[in-house]
A protein has these predicted regions:
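A short coil-to-beta-strand element that immediately follows conserved catalytic motifs
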Residues: 85-95
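Residue-level detector of short, conserved catalytic/binding motifs and their immediate flanks
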Residues: 95, 116, 189
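Catalytic core of non-heme Fe(II) oxygenases with the double-stranded beta-helix
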Residues: 98-170, 180, 197, 201-209
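Glycine-rich nucleotide phosphate-binding loop and flanking beta-alpha elements
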Residues: 177
Length: 214
């Protein structure tokens, strides 16, 4: 006698990495703004000696980045909408450009005191496999690691995503991530940003009303 059954996997407690991809026209507009904003950093003789340069963290307030700032805000809004979060009153708390050069890598880190973080890629080198690595936040998943026949979202303990020009990734600010060694002779240019709710007092209200319980 054979035993017959049906099965299905249910994905719960997900860690959402939200991808936003610009069309070619929008990508050129935004990338031109970013390159104009950071040209002094690119042309600075001192900065050229370094493997990594970052700008001030208030680029979202720059008049030169009007379209880029609007894009970042819209991407954040779409991310919150996708998650069905009702609180859409937020503001960008920090925004800065990163200029990464050959042999630079960024350590494993998170972005504290924010709800959502993002990174937008302005310039990358496809031939050198530019990537960003997100780490599984579940420490228990690193204790026993069987070898899978094929890696997928159900058995992985990390996500290695392509850093592609015109693409932004948005993710929970608590999610730890890192950047592998940059192997290209060309600069990799990205813009990172964080956002936080402005109506925290409404978020912290108790989620129940008056009741009498037996």
């Amino acid at each position: 006698m054979s035993i017959n059954f049906k099965s299905k996997a249910q994905l719960w407690f997900p860690t959402t990495i939200f991808q936003v991809t610009l069309d070619d026209v929008s990508k050129k507009i935004i990338n031109d703004e970013i390159m104009m904003e950071i040209k002094d950093h690119l042309n600075n003789p001192e900065s050229k000696k370094s493997t990594y340069v970052n700008t001030d963290t208030n680029l979202h307030k720059s008049k030169k980045l009007k379209q880029a700032s609007a894009f970042f805000n819209r991407a954040i809004f779409e991310y919150l909408k996708f998650l069905k979060i009702e609180h859409h009153d937020f503001e960008i708390s920090g925004c800065w450009a990163n200029i990464s050069r050959k042999n630079f890598s960024h350590h494993n880190h998170s972005h504290q005191n924010n709800f959502v973080s993002g990174v937008y890629y302005c310039k990358t080198d496809k031939g050198k496999s530019d990537k960003i690595h997100f780490n599984d936040p579940r420490e228990q998943n690193k204790v026993i690691i069987p070898v899978p026949s094929e890696q997928n979202i159900y058995n992985s303990n990390g996500a290695l995503l392509d850093a592609t020009e015109g693409v932004a990734y948005l993710f929970p600010s608590w999610l730890r991530h890192e950047v592998p060694i940059h192997k290209s002779e060309e600069d990799r240019i990205s813009v990172a940003f964080n956002a936080m709710f402005t109506d925290l007092e409404s978020l912290s209200k108790p989620g129940f009303s008056a009741a009498i319980r037996e």
